[in-house]
Amino acid sequence: MERIKELRNLMSQSRTREILTKTTVDHMAIIKKYTSGRQEKNPSLRMKWMMAMKYPITADKRITEMIPERNEQGQTLWSKMNDAGSDRVMVSPLAVTWWNRNGPMTSTVHYPKIYKTYFEKVERLKHGTFGPVHFRNQVKIRRRVDINPGHADLSAKEAQDVIMEVVFPNEVGARILTSESQLTITKEKKEELQDCKISPLMVAYMLERELVRKTRFLPVAGGTSSVYIEVLHLTQGTCWEQMYTPGGEVRNDDVDQSLIIAARNIVRRAAVSADPLASLLEMCHSTQIGGTKMVDILRQNPTEEQAVDICKAAMGLRISSSFSFGGFTFKRTSGSSVKREEEVLTGNLQTLKIRVHDGYEEFTMVGKRATAILRKATRRLIQLIVSGRDEQSIAEAIIVAMVFSQEDCMIKAVRGDLNFVNRANQRLNPMHQLLRHFQKDAKVLFQNWGIEHIDSVMGMIGILPDMTPSTEMSMRGVRVSKMGVDEYSSAERVVVSIDRFLRVRDQRGNVLLSPEEVSETQGTEKLTITYSSSMMWEINGPESVLVNTYQWIIRNWETVKIQWSQNPTMLYNKMEFEPFQSLVPKAIRGQYSGFVRTLFQQMRDVLGTFDTTQIIKLLPFAAAPPKQSRMQFSSLTVNVRGSGMRILVRGNSPVFNYNKTTKRLTILGKDAGTLTEDPDEGTAGVESAVLRGFLILGKEDRRYGPALSINELSNLAKGEKANVLIGQGDVVLVMKRKRDSSILTDSQTATKRIRMAIN
């Protein structure tokens, strides 16, 4: 205040005012400030000052031949004076106006293609809707966000190669375009840009925008997908927010969203299979998202989410070094700890073996709706500062931090037994047992935690066990803050290892991720996800399992047929029949399997009773571990459409319907494909199955009489030879074996021998 009074005094004296307004600016320090260095110190002033001059622009000399000296109003467009220090002409801003109105027209066809990202942005904004402005405190946290909607996901190096190939195809330099996306984009762009007159440098810049993901570390309070980030300056300020719905979606956001859904589905499914890691890899390699291989997307896409990171770890890719617990991403910011096993007793006197973090550590915790700073010592929470969108989100963060602290009062707050299991019915590890327990009900935990008096600190407030805010008291060590905690900014990636149960560890052996951390949230993917793996058939429900199982048998009938006769056990154990078992009532699965296997064995033994349709229809039932019983069935039940439906052992039913005339199979009215051979030929294509017990000697030999049908063969005595007519109308010479022991190998060699005999 004193200073201001003093200045007012000075200004009231006329002499002061005169000095300040009239003195020339020729002070050395000032001249130095504004003239040293290439950097313009006051760009807007410079611009205004330049534009006030008559000829502020310089142009190439050739312009004088293309633009008249004066315009229609008689104003001079360019000066005869040369620009000092260059051989360019000085030009008036009016010349630009003249050029825009009267200059040569060029084709504009390439502009929307080159400036695609800009044109699309305009469309999105045109169709977007801006809602009301709300004034409220904004809890922004810095997150790494994608600022460039509509891009492909190439690495900088891959993009550079594509750009060089498109813009400067004849330049020398090693360019290897390897990935599918690189080749597709290059081909597409070369076609689009034929005869393009836009400067190559501009084209290169714009291509880079289209091909590479650009991320920035920005304070965000709302949506983080790129179509929200491009309007960040319009939707949130320090104390206000404006509602906004984007007027269009972009593929990169859709890819990110669909990738997360696919990864979650795959991790959840793999976790319950016999070999989770192998299953996970098989599914990642056979899945496509929006027509692109999932593994290609995983290699290029930087999305960090628990399930996505587990898939990346399985593929041997690097992932972020932060770890996940209770849906929060933890990043240690200081301190260190060693791990040791310790046995603890819950409030229910159940013994738990936990891995204790021994030492002082500080962490940031970042979740979807809440963030926190946690300081802890060995089995003790020292301080937790939480901020979140609402009471519920804040409570979630507090529970996770309390469990993570491993404090005794938390373990003693357990009421009842801990016996939570994962999807595969295996017990969860103790830390996740505790977490699940308190996520269900945290009342006792909060009540037993203890409360303390608090000092008033700017921006901080206390929180009571019932989650109400307070300025006097708070749960011990816990405070709520108005300010969010920034996400971990470094994009550093580390080498990790993964075990067969999908637990991901860093090189020190700390567990970063496990299937328990994968969110159960279900969403609808924006892009089509095609899971080719049989493990994912059940994702669309029982009907899909039924149709897919039979489609698989029909598609692979040639190999299935041979295995059916030669190595049935191997066939029954195929993973493609696994999903089907969930449709068969549990109590009767074993009996069905025993019945079908016996039936199949009779088919193999009694010649000529082979029936393709029946084998296809009953095969999936034979996959369950068989129970021996004398039960016979005329129909088998499957649980689809919410009730049991019957498949007839002999004949068609709504579930399984084979049309002999069209050779088409329909399952529950859905087309399941065409059989390439006619099941009525009884013998067609399965000589290997039927000729067990016979040795194929070669081509037809007339000395052994006319050709018999396969059914007549059973009358031969051991060692007797005969010509036999096989499925395709060919005749071969066979001999009935003297010993039964070698019957199994017959069917394996039969197929080969028949081919040789015929050819």
Swiss-Prot record:
Disulfide bonds: none annotated. The keyword Nucleotide-binding does not apply. The record marks 627 as: Mammalian adaptation. One of its GO terms (biological process) is symbiont-mediated suppression of host gene expression. One of its GO terms (cellular component) is host cell mitochondrion. Plays an essential role in transcription initiation and cap-stealing mechanism, in which cellular capped pre-mRNAs are used to generate primers for viral transcription. Recognizes and binds the 7-methylguanosine-containing cap of the target pre-RNA which is subsequently cleaved after 10-13 nucleotides by the viral protein PA. Plays a role in the initiation of the viral genome replication and modulates the activity of the ribonucleoprotein (RNP) complex. Influenza RNA polymerase is composed of three subunits: PB1, PB2 and PA. Interacts (via N-terminus) with PB1 (via C-terminus). Interacts with nucleoprotein NP (via N-terminus). Interacts (via N-terminus) with host MAVS (via N-terminus); this interaction inhibits host innate immune response. Belongs to the influenza viruses PB2 family. This is Polymerase basic protein 2. It comes from Influenza A virus (strain A/Hickox/1940 H1N1).
